[in-house]
Regions:
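Short, charge-rich amphipathic alpha-helices with coiled-coil/heptad character
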Residues: 1-43, 96, 103-104
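Long amphipathic alpha-helical coiled-coil segments
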Residues: 34-46, 82, 89, 93, ...
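Preference for long, well-ordered alpha-helical segments
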Residues: 119-146
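Long amphipathic all-alpha helical oligomerization modules
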Residues: 1, 73, 84-88, 142-146
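Extended alpha-helical coiled-coil "stalk/arm" regions
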Residues: 38-72, 76
Length: 146
């Protein structure tokens, strides 16, 4: 009987080991998939940040043109006032709205990167959970400076 119990125990333990190995392989696959997604998101984030810098540069140029046009003393009248109003309100407002929308996209990308990183951290036990909390706080801080 002892051999039969030992054999059953070995079979049960072998099944558990197989189950743990499958779980580990699945977690490693999820981890690798998340890392690939994070890499693509970081590339997109860099491209969008570069676009934002370009738009901000265009907005600065537009503001300079608007100020120079406003300072021009050779042209006066209602048409000049209409054009100045359009330049200073409509166009500048549109630039600011566009930049704010880019910021919202960057924040969303940062949130998704953090979510994926935290998923990976949480596979590492209690230290991973603590690291995920710190990572979330760091993300909120980083978004303030977008």
């Amino acid at each position: 009987m002892s051999n039969n119990n030992n054999e059953q125990l070995r079979t049960a333990l072998g099944a558990q080991v197989g189950q743990y190995e499958n779980e580990r392989a699945w977690q490693q696959q999820c981890y690798a998939e998340n890392e690939a997604k994070i890499s693509r998101l970081q590339e997109a984030k860099q491209a969008i940040q570069q676009s934002k810098e370009n738009v901000e540069a265009c907005a600065d140029v537009w503001k300079t043109i608007s100020l120079n046009f406003e300072a021009d003393q050779d042209w006066e009248g209602a048409h000049k006032n209409d054009i100045l109003n359009c330049m200073s309100t409509a166009v500048e407002t549109d630039y600011n709205t566009y930049i704010s929308n880019i910021d919202a996209v960057l924040d969303a990308i940062c949130d998704e990167i953090t979510r994926l990183e935290n998923e990976n951290w949480k596979t590492m036990g209690i230290i991973g959970h603590l690291s995920a909390l710190i990572n979330s706080l760091w993300n909120e801080n980083s978004k303030l400076f977008n």
